[in-house]
Amino acid sequence: MAKLETLPVRADPGRDPLLAFAPRPSELGPPDPRLAMGSVGSGVAHAQEFAMKSVGTRTGGGGSQGSFPGPRGSGSGASRERPGRYPSEDKGLANSLYLNGELRGSDHTDVCGNVVGSSGGSSSSGGSDKAPPQYREPSHPPKLLATSGKLDQCSEPLVRPSAFKPVVPKNFHSMQNLCPPQTNGTPEGRQGPGGLKGGLDKSRTMTPAGGSGSGLSDSGRNSLTSLPTYSSSYSQHLAPLSASTSHINRIGTASYGSGSGGSSGGGSGYQDLGTSDSGRASSKSGSSSSMGRPGHLGSGEGGGGGLPFAACSPPSPSALIQELEERLWEKEQEVAALRRSLEQSEAAVAQVLEERQKAWERELAELRQGCSGKLQQVARRAQRAQQGLQLQVLRLQQDKKQLQEEAARLMRQREELEDKVAACQKEQADFLPRIEETKWEVCQKAGEISLLKQQLKDSQADVSQKLSEIVGLRSQLREGRASLREKEEQLLSLRDSFSSKQASLELGEGELPAACLKPALTPVDPAEPQDALATCESDEAKMRRQAGVAAAASLVSVDGEAEAGGESGTRALRREVGRLQAELAAERRARERQGASFAEERRVWLEEKEKVIEYQKQLQLSYVEMYQRNQQLERRLRERGAAGGASTPTPQHGEEKKAWTPSRLERIESTEI
């Protein structure tokens, strides 16, 4: 639903009110900004509005100044000429001069809307008459509103064909508060004798919706914008009216009053209304008003008294012919409007096809781009494959060259080996007699070797015999050594006893003078000193006697043995003792050498031990350091995990625990063997 407000336009009372709507010279110059800058839908709506204009406004009396100059004269059969431009048609001409944004001043049309040249005229009209531009066929396609985006998102088509009437909703609101025409305070039913004449004039002068001068800017979306309303000084202010889309229920009419003369008659209040249903206007009201009852067509003109409808005279043939011509002209205009709407629909379809073509071109460009990208990828892959094949070919060529070189080298080696084999065969042929000679020599040597083996066996038997003799002698030597060792032990014991006896004897000899001097110094009883002396002498004598007896016995035994052995035994013993002493010295030297070797081995072993211990210490220290580093890393990982996963506060640097380091004593104890 859209709402309209009509504003009154006051005209000069001295002028004809209908001439106020005639185009001024200034109006034909610059284009109407509403038409020039409006949307394409406004132009389409204007074109359809002009095409559906009714012919009711072309009728009127010829006697009064305020009536339209019409083709009805005295009713003679002379050829009727088209009247000049009606005010509404002139206004439509002024508005349609800039239809679709272009001034087509050189185009002229006849009564039926056919386009003629600028100098030529129609056969049924005068040479200077031109049809209003709203009845012409546009030479250029209408400019449609550019819609961005996809076409399938549009809720409504751009141009609706005018051949189909939209469905009228049941709850639509008609246009209200339309003021009746000015009747100078007298109701329409209570007028004077000219009331019927005024009613006929009113029915004949009704204009359809979409008269000239109206402006539509809906662009096919049901909106009404700035519809100017023309009214004379005799019309009243029209209240705001609300209209349903594509329907106009009432059109402002103008009546001519029945006064004295044409100047006293009232002017018509002409209003132009426009709908907002894709620029379509209904012409049924105009056609119905123009096709009124026959009694209306033959009514008198001027200020005569009105007659009832039953007493009206039948219409004249000229009026019927004019009415039929007007109906024919209206139908032709409807056909032209349908043709224009069809062209506009074709333009819309062309635009749709153009947009689809653009979409297809975009898709084709995308497909080309994708195909070009895929072709580039395939080309790159083919190039990489070609490069890989070239590299493989180069490698195979290099391998082939290497194999050829290796084959040539093997051929040279084969030739060299063949030469060596030939030389070896020649040498073998030369060595055959020498080999035979060496075989005979080998046989001779084998005999000699067997003989030598026999001699070796004999010598081995002699050696074994000698060895057995040596073993016997060694056993005898052991026995002699054992007896000599016993003798030496006895001699040593005798020497020890002799030395001890001699020492005791010397001690006794040293004590004897002191003991002898003691009795002389002290007067004693001759019996007591003798007893003490006897006891002392007895003790000393016992000791001396025992020592002397032992020494004498030993000397006697030694002397006896020495004398018994004789000088030969002594010499042999001395030789044996010298030999034994030499063996003992050699044994001592061997023992010293063995001790020195043992000491050297011990020293080397100690050095190796120290080295091993040092290595173990270093290895253990490295293990300990590795363990400490692992503990530090684990602690850092735990701290990082705690800082990232939980919100536990990290310990401060001063509160961190020191890493465990083993002491030197623990290291030494752990490395001891």
UniProtKB/Swiss-Prot annotation:
<keyword id="KW-0597">Phosphoprotein</keyword>
<comment type="function">
    <text>May be involved in promoting the maturation of dendritic spines, probably via regulating SIPA1L1 levels at the postsynaptic density of synapses.</text>
</comment>
<keyword id="KW-0175">Coiled coil</keyword>
<feature type="region of interest" description="Disordered">
    <location>
        <begin position="251"/>
        <end position="317"/>
    </location>
</feature>
<feature type="region of interest" description="Disordered">
    <location>
        <begin position="1"/>
        <end position="157"/>
    </location>
</feature>
<feature type="compositionally biased region" description="Polar residues">
    <location>
        <begin position="173"/>
        <end position="186"/>
    </location>
</feature>
<dbReference type="Pfam" id="PF06818">
    <property type="entry name" value="Fez1"/>
</dbReference>
<keyword id="KW-0206">Cytoskeleton</keyword>
<keyword id="KW-0770">Synapse</keyword>
<feature type="coiled-coil region">
    <location>
        <begin position="571"/>
        <end position="639"/>
    </location>
</feature>
<keyword id="KW-0966">Cell projection</keyword>
<feature type="compositionally biased region" description="Low complexity">
    <location>
        <begin position="274"/>
        <end position="294"/>
    </location>
</feature>
<dbReference type="GO" id="GO:0005856">
    <property type="term" value="C:cytoskeleton"/>
</dbReference>
<feature type="compositionally biased region" description="Gly residues">
    <location>
        <begin position="258"/>
        <end position="269"/>
    </location>
</feature>
<feature type="region of interest" description="Disordered">
    <location>
        <begin position="635"/>
        <end position="673"/>
    </location>
</feature>
<feature type="compositionally biased region" description="Basic and acidic residues">
    <location>
        <begin position="653"/>
        <end position="673"/>
    </location>
</feature>
<keyword id="KW-0963">Cytoplasm</keyword>
<feature type="modified residue" description="Phosphoserine">
    <location>
        <position position="316"/>
    </location>
</feature>
<comment type="similarity">
    <text>Belongs to the LZTS3 family.</text>
</comment>
<feature type="compositionally biased region" description="Low complexity">
    <location>
        <begin position="215"/>
        <end position="235"/>
    </location>
</feature>
<dbReference type="GO" id="GO:0061001">
    <property type="term" value="P:regulation of dendritic spine morphogenesis"/>
</dbReference>
<feature type="compositionally biased region" description="Basic and acidic residues">
    <location>
        <begin position="79"/>
        <end position="92"/>
    </location>
</feature>
<feature type="coiled-coil region">
    <location>
        <begin position="317"/>
        <end position="496"/>
    </location>
</feature>
<protein>
    <recommendedName>
        <fullName>Leucine zipper putative tumor suppressor 3</fullName>
    </recommendedName>
</protein>
<dbReference type="InterPro" id="IPR045329">
    <property type="entry name" value="LZTS"/>
</dbReference>
<feature type="modified residue" description="Phosphoserine">
    <location>
        <position position="318"/>
    </location>
</feature>
<dbReference type="GO" id="GO:0005737">
    <property type="term" value="C:cytoplasm"/>
</dbReference>
<dbReference type="GO" id="GO:0043197">
    <property type="term" value="C:dendritic spine"/>
</dbReference>
<feature type="compositionally biased region" description="Gly residues">
    <location>
        <begin position="295"/>
        <end position="307"/>
    </location>
</feature>
<dbReference type="GO" id="GO:0014069">
    <property type="term" value="C:postsynaptic density"/>
</dbReference>
<feature type="region of interest" description="Disordered">
    <location>
        <begin position="172"/>
        <end position="239"/>
    </location>
</feature>
<comment type="subunit">
    <text>Interacts (via C-terminus) with SHANK3 (via PDZ domain). Interacts (via coiled coil) with SIPA1L1. Can form homooligomers.</text>
</comment>
<dbReference type="GO" id="GO:0045202">
    <property type="term" value="C:synapse"/>
</dbReference>
